[in-house]
Amino acid sequence: MLAKRIIPCLDVKDGQVVKGVKFNELKLAGDPVELAQKYDREGADELVFLDITASIEDRGTMLEVVEKTAKNVFIPFTVGGGIKTVDDMRRLLQAGADKVSINSAAVKNPELISQGSDRFGSQCIVVAIDTKKTEEGYQVFINGGTKNTGIPLMDWVKEVKYRGAGEILLTSIDHDGGKNGYDNDIINQVARVSNIPVIASGGAGTIEDFYNVFHKGQASGALAASVFHFEEISVKELKNYLSEKGVEVRL
């Protein structure tokens, strides 16, 4: 039985972490490397950095963040946002990222998944999928969750798996930011259909939500941002709770 993973998510814009960060003991609350080190010390299993910098010219800043993080942090981390080519992947992996995450670019050009997987190995390729329930059922959304592609979720999950993705990062747009728990039913279905690790994202509000996403959702990892950034839940406390409830975690 593989240990379940707890994964803080850091949204980085112009080299700073955004989306409310409240850390009293840090000199620079928005410094991604400091935050990454803090989560590493607390026992997080992995980290995800999402580069939400608007302009393409500023991508160099993210490479610096990746290089610094790789030197100072000893847990695996994934970088996503703005990756459109195999060359983009190569630059981030060479800078020290363990995995890259692709979302809209993969939907527009599914061959990118195959190319990345062939070149770097499937273990490096995470496909992020944003989904929302519509009248036609769950469908895939792109461009930050604003555009419905009309692609049925399960069709895309099967294609992503077939093309060599190593894992899926599944965000339920309806649950994101709501703090009412993860969308466990759809996470469970995606985990069963894909048969590759699924990281659940969107909806964490309490420590019970994490137990439920592992128990009911059968997720391999649980990603969250604000509950960690605002110190509503500490990684250490969360892992102790999960362990007491019989969930296999790395303590």
From Swiss-Prot:
Entry's EC annotation: 4.3.2.10
Pfam families noted in UniProt: His_biosynth (PF00977)
Catalytic activity from the UniProt record: 5-[(5-phospho-1-deoxy-D-ribulos-1-ylimino)methylamino]-1-(5-phospho-beta-D-ribosyl)imidazole-4-carboxamide + L-glutamine = D-erythro-1-(imidazol-4-yl)glycerol 3-phosphate + 5-amino-1-(5-phospho-beta-D-ribosyl)imidazole-4-carboxamide + L-glutamate + H(+)
Any one Gene Ontology cellular component term annotated for this protein: cytoplasm
Swiss-Prot/TrEMBL GO biological process terms: L-histidine biosynthetic process
Keyword Lyase on entry: yes
Pathway: Amino-acid biosynthesis; L-histidine biosynthesis; L-histidine from 5-phospho-alpha-D-ribose 1-diphosphate: step 5/9
Ranges that cross the membrane: none
Enzyme class (EC, first level): lyase
Example GO molecular function: lyase activity
Active site: 11, 130
Main location, first listed in the record: cytoplasm
Alphabetically ordered keywords of this record: Amino-acid biosynthesis, Cytoplasm, Histidine biosynthesis, Lyase
Cellular location(s): Cytoplasm
Job of this protein: IGPS catalyzes the conversion of PRFAR and glutamine to IGP, AICAR and glutamate. The HisF subunit catalyzes the cyclization activity that produces IGP and AICAR from PRFAR using the ammonia provided by the HisH subunit.
SUBUNIT field: Heterodimer of HisH and HisF.
Family, per entry: Belongs to the HisA/HisF family.
Listed name of the protein: Imidazole glycerol phosphate synthase subunit HisF
Organism: Natranaerobius thermophilus (strain ATCC BAA-1301 / DSM 18059 / JW/NM-WN-LF)
Designated gene of the protein: hisF
